[in-house]
C-alpha cells in the first residue's frame, strides 16, 4: 500500500509541473503579443522604424500595462531632449496613443503620487533637471520644460524607475 501511495504521489506532482510550465508559456505568449502590439503602435505613430526605449507599466491602475516610449534619432530629438510618448494599454493587447511630450530625457520615473487616476511621471529636461508631469484628465503636459521641478528624493519608496539614464 505504501509503494502504491508513493507511486500515486509521484503521478500527482507531474501535472502540477506541467500546469506551471503551461502558465509560464501562456505568459510568454501574452508578453510577446503585448510587445508586438506596442511595436505596431509606435510604428503607426512615427510612420517609420524609429529607435526607442520602452517600459511597460500600469500607469492608470486598470490592471493592463501601459507603455512609456522615449523615441530617439534626429527626427525626434533636439537640444532639449527627445519626444516621449505614453500609450494606453488595451485589453486586446494593442496600445492607443495617449500623450506626447517633447524635450524629455532619462531618467524617467513613475512617482508614488497620482493625479486623476494616472501615476505622476518625472522626466529629466535639460536646463531644469527632473520635473513632475501630472495627468490633466486628457493627457500629460506636452512641454516638460514648463512643468514644476521635482525636488523630492526620486529613490523614495513608491517611485518606480521606468527608464534609467542612457548614453546619448
Where are each of the predicted segments found?
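Repetitive beta-architecture junctions, highlighting loop-to-beta-strand starts
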Residues: 52, 82-84, 128
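Acidic, small-residue rich beta-repeat scaffolds with periodic aromatic anchors
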Residues: 3-29, 109-168
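Acidic, divalent-cation-chelating loop motifs in proteins
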Residues: 55-62, 111-112
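Short, flexible beta-strand-to-coil junctions
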Residues: 70-75, 88-91, 123-129
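Short consensus segments that form the blades of beta-propeller domains
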Residues: 44-45, 74-79
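Beta-propeller blade repeat segments, especially FG-GAP/WD-type strand-to-loop junctions
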Residues: 20-30, 34, 79-99, 132-140
Amino acid at each position: 500500500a505504501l509503494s502504491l501511495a508513493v507511486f500515486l504521489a509521484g503521478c500527482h506532482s507531474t501535472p502540477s509541473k506541467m500546469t506551471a510550465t503551461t502558465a509560464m508559456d501562456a505568459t510568454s505568449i501574452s508578453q510577446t503579443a503585448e510587445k508586438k502590439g506596442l511595436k505596431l503602435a509606435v510604428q503607426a505613430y512615427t510612420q517609420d522604424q524609429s529607435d526607442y526605449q520602452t517600459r511597460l507599466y500600469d500607469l492608470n491602475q486598470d490592471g493592463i500595462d501601459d507603455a512609456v516610449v522615449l523615441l530617439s534619432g534626429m527626427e525626434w530629438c533636439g537640444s532639449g531632449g527627445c519626444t516621449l510618448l505614453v500609450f494606453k494599454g488595451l485589453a486586446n493587447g494593442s496600445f492607443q496613443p495617449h500623450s506626447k511630450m517633447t524635450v524629455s530625457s532619462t531618467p524617467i520615473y513613475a512617482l508614488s503620487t497620482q493625479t486623476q487616476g494616472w501615476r505622476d511621471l518625472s522626466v529629466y529636461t535639460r536646463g531644469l533637471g527632473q520635473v513632475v508631469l501630472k495627468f490633466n484628465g486628457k493627457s500629460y503636459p506636452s512641454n516638460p520644460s514648463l512643468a514644476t521641478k521635482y525636488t523630492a528624493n526620486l529613490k523614495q519608496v513608491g517611485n518606480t524607475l521606468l527608464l534609467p539614464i542612457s548614453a546619448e
